[in-house]
């Protein structure tokens, strides 16, 4: 997908990517240089490991449903 950098240096993240990553107005992201490109990672998501019945299980407050998972899979295929 292509995006344009405006005069103020802003980039609009295309809607399919925002939806796939769960980005909403006010979401924060970590942005860094990655080779000849940029690496953009949503922040503020928490996950931790807790023991349940002797097994470590990832828990957190971020909800992920099938739509988010399929969106991530589809965005990785394009």
Curated annotation (Swiss-Prot):
GO molecular function per UniProt: DNA binding
Pfam families recorded: MazE_antitoxin (PF04014)
Domain SpoVT-AbrB: residue ranges: 1-45
UniProt keyword terms in alphabetical order: DNA-binding, Toxin-antitoxin system
Entry annotated with the keyword DNA-binding: yes
NCBIfam families: lp_hng_hel_AbrB
Similarity field: Belongs to the VapB family.
Assembly notes: Interacts with cognate toxin VapC27 and non-cognate toxins MazF6 and VapC40. Interaction with MazF6 and MazF9 partially neutralizes the toxins.
Functional note: Antitoxin component of a type II toxin-antitoxin (TA) system. Cognate toxin is VapC27. Upon expression in E.coli partially counteracts the ribonuclease activity of non-cognate toxins MazF6 and MazF9.
Protein name as it appears in the record: Antitoxin VapB27
Gene expressing this chain: vapB27
């Amino acid at each position: 997908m292509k995006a344009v950098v405006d005069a103020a240096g802003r980039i609009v993240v295309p809607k399919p990517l925002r939806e796939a990553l769960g980005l909403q107005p006010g979401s924060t992201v970590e942005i860094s240089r990655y080779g000849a490109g940029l690496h953009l990672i949503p922040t503020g998501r928490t996950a931790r490991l807790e023991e349940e019945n002797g097994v470590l299980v990832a828990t957190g407050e971020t909800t992920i449903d099938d739509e988010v998972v399929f969106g991530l899979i589809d965005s990785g295929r394009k």
